[in-house]
Structure formats: structure tokens, C-alpha cells
Regions:
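Glycine-/acidic-rich phosphate or pyrophosphate-binding loops and their flanking alpha/beta elements
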Residues: 9-13, 156-167, 178-205
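Thiamine diphosphate
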Residues: 1-171
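Short, acidic Gly/Pro/Ser/Thr-rich loop/turn segments
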Residues: 122-123, 176-178
């Protein structure tokens, strides 16, 4: 199997979605001309144009709200935070709107939106850019949260997240963007909500974060 970087796996999944589904578009801070805080969207603006790769103001509340509206109207937005730390600014939109619309409408309105968010510390960006709120968000009914740990999982999970008809948060550990791993050329997805059993046995370790 070819070996690729974590960021390249994400980029492949995003590019596939943009190429194959005209309803998919992206928006976030510096994802266009700058190519994203971690270079995941580098080259996308030139390839797909400003109608589908939208640089936004520094207002997570505004562009998450815009993403929810676009998703409810039938599009499939992919919203990018520079850091999951800034999800706090958009908690009202995420928790009270994105997570609830399907239930409040009796299933008449879906919110097929992906929120991508670098998470964690270790990249010298200071305390305000180094939080890990994925466990908070995972407690919200109506929100799915995935956190890939290698390029194989990153590609399989981003593919499934984009196809899901409900909001999915992809928490991407910032320390892993430069990590390499084996990823097959053949198409695959990783089912959301299904545990990955890496090794079977009789002993269980419980790790609390």
C-alpha cells in the first residue's frame, strides 16, 4: 500500500467529494488563498474556485450558522475551524441548531454538515489554540464526533462524514498532520459509530481523558 501523510489523506477525501458532488463546498478561515492552517486545502481555490472554496471572516458563529442554513437548504457544507478551541464561539449554533434541527422538524430537515477542527496541543500555538473539546461535543445528542489517529482512518472517516446526513465533527489531532501511514488506492469508507477492534483478547484497559 502507498504511504501518505495524514494531511494528504484528508485532502484526498475532500477533493473526491468536491469533484463528485456539486452540493459540496467548503468555508473557513484562510482555507482558500492560504491553503488552510495545516495545508490540507492547498490548491483547492485554484481548482474549484471561490464559489466552492470560501474564505470567511474570523467569526465562527457566523460561518457555522451559514453552514447550517446551507445544509438545511440541501447543500453539503464542510466548515473548517483553525482550532477546535474556537468551537466555543459557535456552541449555540452547533448544540442548539445543528444538533437539534432534525428532531425539532420531525425528520423533515437534515443538517449534512461536516465541521473539521484541528485539536490538541504540542504545536507551539499557545493555550488558546491547544484545547481538546471533542469529548464535550461527543456528549451532545445529534452530533457525531470522529477523531482519526492515522492516515488510513483519516481518509475512511472523512469520506463517511461527508456522506452522512447529520452533522459530523472531525477532530484532527494537530500533531498528526505530518505523520505517514499506509493507505490503499482502492476506495473504502469507515462506518461511523462502529468500534475498531485493533486487538482482541480477555483484558480491558479503560483510559479517561
Amino acid at each position: 500500500m502507498p504511504e501518505i501523510l495524514f494531511r494528504e489523506a484528508l485532502k484526498r477525501g475532500l477533493q473526491e467529494a468536491l469533484e463528485n458532488d456539486p452540493r459540496v463546498f467548503m468555508m473557513g478561515e484562510d482555507i482558500g488563498e492560504y491553503g488552510g492552517a495545516y495545508a490540507v486545502t492547498d490548491g483547492f481555490l485554484e481548482k474549484f474556485g471561490p464559489e466552492r472554496i470560501k474564505d470567511t471572516p474570523i467569526s465562527e458563529q457566523a460561518f457555522v450558522g451559514a453552514g447550517i442554513g446551507a445544509a438545511a437548504a440541501g447543500l453539503r457544507p464542510i466548515v473548517e475551524f483553525m482550532s477546535i478551541s474556537f468551537s466555543l464561539v459557535a456552541f449555540d449554533q452547533i448544540v442548539n441548531m445543528a444538533a437539534n434541527l432534525r428532531y425539532m422538524s420531525g425528520g423533515q430537515i437534515n443538517v449534512p454538515m461536516v465541521i473539521r477542527a484541528p485539536t490538541g496541543a504540542g504545536v507551539q500555538l499557545g493555550a488558546t489554540h491547544s484545547q481538546s473539546f471533542e469529548t464535550w461535543l461527543a456528549e451532545v445528542p445529534g452530533i457525531k464526533v470522529v477523531c482519526p489517529s492515522n492516515p488510513y482512518d483519516a481518509l475512511g472517516l472523512i469520506r463517511s462524514a461527508i456522506k452522512d446526513d447529520n452533522p459530523v465533527i472531525v477532530a484532527e489531532p494537530a500533531l498528526l498532520y505530518g505523520d505517514k501511514g499506509n493507505v490503499p488506492d482502492e476506495y473504502y469508507e469507515i462506518e461511523l459509530g462502529k468500534a475498531d477492534v485493533s486487538r482482541s483478547g480477555t483484558d480491558l484497559s479503560l483510559i479517561h481523558i
